[in-house]
UniProtKB/Swiss-Prot annotation:
Originating species: Arthroderma gypseum (strain ATCC MYA-4604 / CBS 118893)
Family: Belongs to the peptidase S8 family.
Function: Secreted subtilisin-like serine protease with keratinolytic activity that contributes to pathogenicity.
Signal in keyword set: yes
Prodomain positions: 20-116
Name used for this protein in its record: Subtilisin-like protease 3
Encoding gene, per UniProt annotation: SUB3
Length: 397
């Protein structure tokens, strides 16, 4: 009898441990103090989700009254193709309560997310378009299918885009802003990447429609939660406009590893949006960066005009493809141009080619695989365990 009682107690203890959500506590100097992302288990209904939020808000308010905490509580909720969660500013007692809710899958620290661009080089040549449309290097002509991404919507999730720039005339609209109240591109990074994926002069998919989604400030930084909120908005917008299956999303940004960030981009891809992501500029294995380390998306490393890995580019088995990223000329706010280098510049080349492929009938689910099938195996010194395949648009040149 005593043995049965001990076993029962043991099983109850195991059940209690299993019910507790996992806490991704990786630490690091990019952690935003007292800010968290909470992800619910698959299958949690909308009603249960709202009930959980109400309970968390009540617990937070109670703890705030007891301890005089200055935390703000629940901020934003997201639902990306059935992947539900939220972010907020909580004290430790409230987080303990959240972790013990059996509807919660995991909790992680919110973190700073930054641009994946590097330096400006004035008067550099434009070479990326010629490179992705020819099997041999050195060609300056850009050869592409006349559909040029027509009928496809590209979401530029970045620092915003100068929607009045002549490069985008008649094909762009402002989407949303998750970082501040300034609906402009005060940094220039987002305008540059948009110019590469869909600009009239400097772009790959010259006829694609563009949506500006601002998740990073003029200083080039934001948060994981802000990026997730932006992705959530993109999926909702694409669904409302019947664009799922005819959409692409460029993320020329990143931070340290985040399961929530990876899950968000995975759900966007599964919903019917082709997601291109910058590998990062730390010259390290991209498996340690997010959203670059999400297996479901198309992760782009950066190459030079000489078909060599850019010195700054991340590498590793998670890399899907190389694309031009060193000294890329593109649009700048105010109607001008500028030259930037980074995996931020490689990703929009991939995004633009992806949009062009979708316009030609390739399914969103197959775009990245198709790119890898026709890519040129020419990159020298790609990095340990890294593909040597360079982006090619299949023009036949």
């Amino acid at each position: 009898m005593g043995c049965i009682k001990v076993i029962s107690v043991f099983l109850a203890a195991v059940a209690a441990v299993d019910a507790r959500a996992f806490f991704h506590n990786r630490g690091g100097n990019d952690v935003i103090p007292n800010s968290y992302i909470v992800v619910m288990k698959d299958g949690v209904t909308a009603e249960d989700f709202e009930s959980h939020i109400s309970s968390v808000s009540a617990t937070h308010n109670l703890n705030k009254a007891k301890r005089g905490s200055e935390t703000a509580g629940h901020k934003d909720s997201f639902d990306i193709n059935g992947w539900r969660g939220y972010n907020g500013h909580f004290d430790e007692a409230t987080i303990e309560s959240i972790l013990n809710d059996d509807k919660v899958k995991y909790v992680e620290h919110d973190r700073v997310v930054k641009l994946a661009a590097l330096v400006t080089q004035p008067n550099a040549p434009t070479w990326g378009l010629g490179r992705v449309s020819h099997k041999a290097k050195g060609n300056k002509d850009f050869v592409y299918d006349s559909s040029a991404g027509q009928g496809v919507t590209i979401y530029g999730v970045d620092t915003g885009i100068d929607i009045n720039h002549p490069e985008f005339r008649g094909r762009i609209r402002w989407g949303t802003n998750t970082v501040d109240n300034d609906n402009t591109d005060g940094n220039g990074h987002g305008t540059h990447t948009a110019g590469t994926f869909a600009g009239t002069t400097y772009g790959v998919a010259k006829k694609a429609n563009i949506v500006a989604v601002k998740v990073l400030s003029a200083g080039g930084s934001g948060s994981t939660a802000g990026v997730i909120k932006g992705i959530d908005w993109c999926v909702t917008d694409a669904r409302s406009k019947g664009a799922l299956g005819k959409a692409a999303l460029n993320l020329s940004l990143g931070g340290s590893f985040s399961q929530a960030n990876n899950d968000a981009v995975t759900r966007a891809q599964e919903a019917g949006i082709f997601v291109a992501v910058a590998a990062g500029n730390d010259n390290r294995d991209a498996k340690n960066s997010s959203p670059a380390s999400a297996p479901a998306v198309c992760t782009a490393a950066s190459s030079t005009i000489d078909d060599v890995k850019s010195s700054f580019s991340n590498w590793g088995t998670i890399i899907d493809i190389y694309a031009p990223g060193s000294s890329i000329l593109s649009a700048a706010p105010g109607g001008g141009t500028r030259t930037l280098s980074g995996t931020s510049m490689a990703s929009p080349h991939v995004c633009g080619v992806g949009a062009a492929m979708i316009a030609q009938g390739v399914s969103v689910a197959q775009v990245c695989n198709r790119m890898k099938q026709i890519a040129n195996a020419v990159i020298r010194n790609p990095g340990t365990g890294t593909t040597n395949r360079l982006l090619y648009n299949g023009s036949g040149q």
